[in-house]
């Protein structure tokens, strides 16, 4: 059996979105890559699986996001056999009730507590409580199942191009699955975590710290037990390491941003003479130009987001979480349970 798997589209609309063929780019590129995944599945006689996080803002779906995404989902279900795994951005819970736009798209969706079996493949939806995910795994027959697709974090995996790891599960939790692929959504960095565990990754960068990723969707062949990466289409980031004397043609850069949809990351040393001009460029093209102030001997820095302007290498996320829990009066023995929930939310 063959399966095309795409994950973490995070279709959204932002105030600074550039237009591509009359469509905001944060809608255009993820839906374009979904469309291409559908076509690839058809060409290869494969089933299409969308492994969660179709949208970015789960509490309210912008009408334009819904319309374009629903059109592509209609195209998918009318073209190939299509299934969806619910991700943490695809639903919200209120008074113990789960609400999701995915209930209305006319495609089978694996929600927590309702796994879907397709031939030799099992789909398991996301849940905040890892015990609920475990329950869905308990009834899987590993003798006949060659592929499991789900949406959660692993401690051994990279969430992005950083050393931050905060998953609720470990590779050891799936040690019995030696002859079964586990393909996951949730972390945006495409990666092989072990011999049989992979993250698809997002098809286009969702945050600036994903700028060096080779984005993709994948083809899984459970007869040959192989995985093939198919590159996706998205605007690229250009990282420029400035020194004291670097000369920049700002008009050329502006033209590149507007006409070629390029994004720029400037690493600015303390002694750079035109720092003000670069900062002004960042203000003019907020969301497309990112700056980072680098000390002369600064190494191993990881830029994660223009708005936060912090580095994961400098911040121990777990220590911040533990400090917050301590101040909130949470017993130390319960820290990990709360940290797992926090990591799912962020």
Which positions does each model-derived feature cover?
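Conserved catalytic scaffold of divalent metal-dependent phosphoesterases
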Residues: 69, 75, 90-172, 203
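Accessory, non-catalytic peripheral segments of nucleic-acid enzymes
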Residues: 32, 222-346
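Core catalytic region of metal-dependent phosphoesterases/phosphodiesterases
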Residues: 19-115, 175-176
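Active-site environment of divalent metal-dependent phosphoester hydrolases
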Residues: 10-13, 56-59, 85-95, 114-117, ...
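Short acidic/histidine-rich motifs immediately flanking catalytic phosphotransfer sites
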Residues: 43-47, 144-145, 261
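Active-site neighborhood of phospho(di)ester-bond hydrolases with catalytic His/Asp-centered motifs
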Residues: 5-7, 48-53, 81-88, 109-113, ...
